Amino acid sequence: MRFPSLILAPILAAATTIAVTAEEVTLPQDEVASLAAFDRLVAVIEHPRCMNCHTSTDFPRQGNARLRHNMGVARGPENHGTPALQCATCHQDNNAPSGVPGNANWHLAPLSMAWEGLDRRGICRQLTDPARSTMTPEQLVEHMNNDPLVLWAWNPGNDLNGLPREKPPMSAGEFGELVRVWVANGAQCPD
Amino acid sequence: MNTPAPTRRQFLFGISAVAGGLLVGLPESRAQTGHGEVTAWVVITPDDTVTIRVARSDMGQGIFTALPMLVAEELECDWAKVRAEYADTNENLTRDKPWGDMVTSTSISVRASQEYLRQAGAQAREMLIAEAAARWNVTPVSCRARGGIVSHAASGRALRFGALAAAAARRPIPENVPLKAPSDWRLIGTSAARIEAAPKVFAEPIFATDVDLPGMLHAAVKNCPTIGGSVVAFDHAAVAGLPGVRHVVQVGKDAVAVVADSWRQANAAVEALPVTWDESIGTGVSNATLRTLFREGLADPAAAIGHRIDDVGASLGGAAQIIDVEYEAPFLAHATMEPQVCTAKVTAERIDLWAPTQNGEGTTNTIARVMQRDAAQIFVHKLQLGGGFGRRGLAQDWARQSVQIAAQVPGVPVRMLWSREEDFTHDYYRPMVLARQTAGFDAQGRLLGWKVRISGSSIAASLAPFWLKEGVDNALMDGFVEEDMPYAVASFEVGVARRDSHIPVGFWRGVNLSQNGWFREAFLDEIAAMRKIDPYLLRRELLSENPRALATLDAAAKLAGWGKPPAGRHQGIAIVEGDNAWCAQIAEISVTDGRLKVHRISCAVDPNFVVHPDITVQQIEGGIVQGLAAALYGEVTVEDGRVQQTNFHNYRYLRMEEMPVIDVALVPSLGRYGDRWGGVGETGLPPLAPALTNAIHPATGKRLRSLPISNHDLRV
Amino acid sequence: MPVLKVNGSPHEIDLPDDTPLLWALRDTLGLLGTRYGCGAALCGCCTVHADGKALRSCVATLADVAGAEILTIEGLGTAATPHPVQAAWLEIDVAQCGYCQSGQMMQAAALLREIPKPSDADIDAAMSGNLCRCGTYSRVRAAIHRAAEFI
């Protein structure tokens, strides 16, 4: 664990400030913490750096405008592009000085893990539905914390115009910890 | 694996031995003058190989095949033994221009040289026949040449060209040899095997980017980000220590270059080089300010009138209904697939250039002027061009820079290559042009008058000021002036107000017809709509006195099935004459949820005569693709003086998945309407944009009056 | 010294690891058939194969291709023994200026290796990263279908 209680403390503090009237019951603290964590972490999931490759289409998108990927690039049978025009035809192990982004194993998330077009509730359902997520909660924590392709979002390099690509709205560590808290407290989804 | 053996022909790209040695890996050196040269055009060696000299430049338009075919038709040689090589630019000067004009622009190669090339073939043939006849002591008229052999039927004797050539070369060159009638051609009009195909398929080092000379250094250039600005200062020391760096130099007033052991090292250093620029020339200039400038030009009462029929003011004044609209065509880049490149070597005695030039003599003259040398000291070795489209003709900035760099490293060959980013941001752009068109109709919808005002930057002003007539560039009115406004209208007027900026403009495929063809043909559809008449029938009506145009138009309509598009699809039509070649096109499209799909382009073209049908079709296909890419996406924009497009991500070009089916019908009129030959390099382009926007109107109800189409919302 | 395997032969290359493969091929090994068009994997002119897969050599560094078998246009076929793609290219007369054609043919060869009888949709998907400013696309498509018949 990289950022233990540092992040957890304010989340719990926020959870305990919910006003409770006589008629209301108090939510279990873990559920509150899980929902609060999801509410914050989803902003990363919805960011173009993540969403452009978690598409619900047979192609990736690119840029903050989320345009269809140039050159007719398609998902292909194994989410690595079509047989002769693979992601790795252009995307190498590292970001290129020319602005072509790179990371080992550059690819699309499978369609079962598509987030595009879903609201926050839908994204959460996707993440927690064993049939679609293809990841256990523990694997999700690992993916969101340590997968080099996920972490690329925080090292996205410059674009083809030489301008820095926008990073997700919180640090990788903060995001990873929120995922951990969300899962540790039951991976609760908003209704 | 079952593969046919390719017909492999030698392809000589005029690489001559120079001080420093032969180019590594390039084909054998060109036949030396005097070795088998029958005439300046035709070289025949004892093994019967016929080498035909090509004076124009090959940039993909197939003239390394088409021009030799014109010679070979009359020479009566064996086509399988024909090779081609560039005529030497320097020799053309020192031998009093035996190869005539070397300019390669305005689709000129075939149409302007066909007659003297056929004559050159006939002359060499007559010299070979005369030599054989003398040896046999018979009359030349009793002999004939065919398939590389001179024969005398009466005696049954025959001699190969290779056995006759050396002696034939000493005979006088006959003048005005009668040429075959077109009906007697056996080679012209066939899709003969291409001379220049194999070196491209087997990736031989035929391009200027491939020049590799012993001891050669590499240069990368950084031009002032605002074109026309200048270098104030640069910090040589900041990059002097970087790997491979040999020299850091200023190039003219507006660029710097790093010369290094490899291009990658040179480019890394030039990108890291701190330069202070003076960009004041472009301060505040943007597309918006240029639009304002050109709009003011459209209203200029002092516009130069290029063509006038009747009194259009009176016609419009009496109109019951008026259309009065403004069209805008953007700047476009050439974006040749091979960025600007040239190798130069400068010594006290001579300057050698290995150049992808559309105009070998233009390169010579530019360098002679800039370097203050005698033109005879300039040796331009032409190579295959990795695309031209007008970028490498009158615009010789790349050749000048390469010599200005090499001159600072005397005696050492330096290959200068621009990065793609430099290439996009320092072009001579297809001009941005505005047109205001006004048409007046009577109460019954009959057309009374058509008035055109054009304003934009002048290519002549940018590249050839001596072409201006009292400051007026008539080319800005191409397609509307008397010679090429084809429509019989009762009252018409076109006028132009030139407005120049610091953005240089140049020749681009189709030149001014690339805008004006669209203005005219798109507006004609607006007229058709007002008259409530089918746009094809309106064109038929207005072209009724022009059987050649009508035949081309009808051929396209027939090919496309005009008026009967498949369900859900829409058609648009246009016809333009470029370089005496008529070209009519019909675009078949659909628009779904605002998404445009171009399904099919049907095209009929009449260049009068066709040398090589397959090359001709290829050129038309090329014009259509370039026109389609430009209409859909092409746009160079300016912000605070700088061009904003830097690479193919922000200057989109057509890709395979967007390709429509292209059907081309060649309908050569074979001299029925005159002797002038047409050129096909450009005529395929101008009709595309109007055919396309004219199809978008019935599909969406929208009249697109600015390009590119991608700037418009096509949702209904 | 790092070894680069190109067209079946090993070459010792004394260049920094971050050198794009394109420049090692062109400037160091003198293999000039692989061409520079954009430097940013936007045009496909520089396409080679790495272990049989299409690769844009302008963005792939020597580190990226360490240990890979590189094939360039020079190793695809020769006039005497053309690759089916090259034979088809000649038969259909695809090339105009020719500058992009090495990349087009290498990309097409990679496609045919994966899909010996490609559909038009397969061709669209494989070839849309290769630009041709002369507009040879229809013929590229026709030649790929023709090459498939040779295989």
Could you say what each language-model-derived stretch is?
Chain A
Residues 46-80:
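N-terminal, post-signal-peptide region of Sec/Tat-exported proteins
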Residues 48-57, 84-94, 179:
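The canonical Cys-X-X-Cys-His
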Residues 36, 48, 82-85, 174:
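Short, well-structured alpha-helical interface segments that form or flank functional binding sites
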